[in-house]
Amino acid sequence: MRKLAIFTILVALCGSISAQRALRSEFTLYDTREDALTANHSQTVNHIPFVAKSTGTLGALEMFEMEINVPASWNDYNTYLHLENIRTGYDVAINGTMALSSEDGTTPADYFISPQLKQGANKIVLLLRPSSCAELDEGTQKSKAERFTNCYIFAQHRTGIYDFDAAIVAGDDKKLHLELDLIADNSFNFEETISLGYDIYTPENKLVDYAVRELIVPGRSRDTLKVRVDLGAELRYLWSATKPQLYRSTLYIKRNGKPVEYIPLYIGAGKTTFADGKIYRNGTAITIKSAPYNAAKDRIDTRKEILALKSKGINTLKPDSPQPIWFYELCDKLGVYVVERAAINPTQHSDNRAVGGTPSNNPQLVGEYLDRVKGMYYRTRNYSCIIAYTLGSEKAGNGYCMYKAYQWLKSVEKNRPVICLSADGEWNTDQLSL
């Protein structure tokens, strides 16, 4: 109890201190290609499940702790804490220093925590508390998974793949073309040559291309390797809900002559576009038959439920907030579209724009709105199943925060529609009936 009270005081004094959130595709690393293809982390050396032990409660506050040992070899690595299924506001202290704070316990997030770690024993303390923006979560369904499911810590070499954009597009030449942008990170102080590798297989498991390419990256910076490959006249492999065929790729780094840090990737060929109030997949208008749906407690049950919905003619799912990453993997593989939604679900005062009315018109919350929209977008933007984005629920209201959220998302998403379900006839929405 005394430790929790001390930590609560620390939070109050140092709430502005935070570790850097990694706004990027959600991925983890594997030590071998075989483990990457089977999503098996049991042999991944630098991947540690986050298993927190409750150490005290005080009213609505609850504190959890975990100790990890950081080897000397991690001096050459960037360490991230992945938090998911938290369900409320939270703060994290590492070795007695405030590291990060979040009001959004719904959207999974990665945090760069290397600056707070030291060689040897480290104590990570997680404080769960009511969110200061709890009104944004009033209409959000709680995850069916157990709290802290899929939380983990992982280390990535300081010269590695920070992020990627991946697409397979049909050209005017009637061929498919791989467009792969690999964002390489060099966290050392001096220039490094980074060897970036990839392979690409057809949906029928035929190897089409593989290569290792070098990129010189200055110290403390990032650069992008653009891979453009002709995949041949294979329009029969275009992805849609009726033909969920996926190309398979593995990204990796080659270091000291050996491939390391494998990242599995599945890509649906083709493009989703929006015009004249309709969504098109590969130039064909989609007839949307949708249903609200959030993932079940695990992948097995979710697969069963999605197949049951498909058997009833449903081809589009509408979760009320960001889902676990395997949900989108399942939707890509099973052939079902997804309308992605940010974790913005207030239920009251949607029509009241006065002070104390809808939070969507409270300028003090614009940073929180943008954080939630960015967290939603970056982690899943490469999934073919996502055909549209919504900024929040029908009861979210409209105003300054929604205006800024719409403008930001439209600035980065050039093809898929961005919808404000609560725009009420205003300009900050693409016109589409869902």
Where are these regions (language model features)?
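Secreted/periplasmic carbohydrate-active enzymes, especially glycoside hydrolases
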Residues: 1-9, 17-325, 329-335, 387-388, ...
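Substrate-binding/catalytic cleft of secreted carbohydrate-active enzymes
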Residues: 316-434
